[in-house]
Design a protein with these regions (language model features):
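Cytosolic C-terminal regulatory domains/tails of membrane transporters and channels
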Residues: 1-77
Length: 77
């Protein structure tokens, strides 16, 4: 696995408006294959505007893909 606590603390250090970070593995299928997708959920403080959340989630997704060396990582919320 990976050091979740350390990664969550780095996310908070990179953006103080992050309120909470969660991690799960999402299992999905297209009915011919099954995939397990590493999924991070970032909960933002209420004052963060939706367009900023979208931009920052994409930025964190790209960062996490590089950090974890896994292009299948997604960030939601």
């Amino acid at each position: 696995l990976f050091p979740f606590r350390q990664i969550a603390e780095e996310i908070k250090a990179l953006n103080a408006n992050v309120e909470k970070v969660a991690y799960s593995e999402t299992i999905s299928t297209n009915f011919s294959t099954i995939d397990t997708i590493p999924t991070f959920e970032i909960i933002w403080k209420n004052q963060v505007k939706p367009d900023i959340k979208t931009f920052e989630n994409l930025r964190f997704q790209n960062w996490l893909r590089k950090k974890l060396k896994d292009e299948s990582v997604i960030v939601i919320k």
